[in-house]
Amino acid sequence: MPEKLFLTEQEVTFAEEKPILQRYEPGRINNQTIARIASNFHYCWEDEKIFALADKLRENESVMALGVVDRKGTVVGIIVRKDFFNTMVRPYARDVFRNHPVKEIMQETDRYDVNMNLFSVSEEISEDMRRPGVTYYVLTNEEGRFRGIFSTQDMLLYLSQITQSDIALARKLQSRIVRERDFVVGREFEFVASSRTAKGVGGDYYEIRQFEENL
């Protein structure tokens, strides 16, 4: 069968309408898995042109990072918006990268199974969370297919929310044990106590105990 040299009008239309910037739509998520904190779900093919992708990213300012996949859908790298545009503004970048594919400018990054336990991952990236800046990671399924992106910032925000929830719970429990105000009224006396702990949670307490009927 001879090789087809030209696309039909229908094929050209399909090629023009096919989005460069694509998005994975996550299904039901287990709250204990790392998928819970994924914040970016966009990806592109590794053979897309660099400047075509740059135009799409300018139109979608909320995309901070995206996965790069081959035509089988397997993850091969990542594009981080900040680093990508820092490269694009270099002298002669337009001439150098005009017709080059995205795979020539993508970055390598750590990959995690989308079903991995969230807290296990937090332990693995603990060193990265201590460093300045934001580090991005790719989520994949068992076949290596793209399933999203999360970052050290996403993890820190989630852990911060847990901390705030724990503090709120501790404050509620403490208020039940040590009331903010209490009083005892006897025939010849009144005893009033008040306690307000630092930031709503603390170790200070008071105790009222009657030893004898008239004391």
Please state what every model-predicted region is.
Residues 71-72, 142-143, 212:
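Residue-level recognition of short loop/turn positions
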Residues 75-78, 145-146:
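Glycine-rich acetyl-CoA-binding "A-motif" of GNAT/NAT acetyltransferases
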Residues 135-141, 147-151:
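Amphipathic alpha-helical protein-interaction segments
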Residues 162-215:
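… and, occasionally, acidic/histidine-rich disordered N-termini of signaling adaptors
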Residues 1-14, 60:
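Terminal presequence/propeptide segments associated with secretion/organelle targeting
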Residues 9-40, 80-134, 151-181:
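Tandem CBS (Bateman) regulatory domains
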Residues 43-63, 69-70, 112-134, 140:
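The conserved cystathionine-beta-synthase
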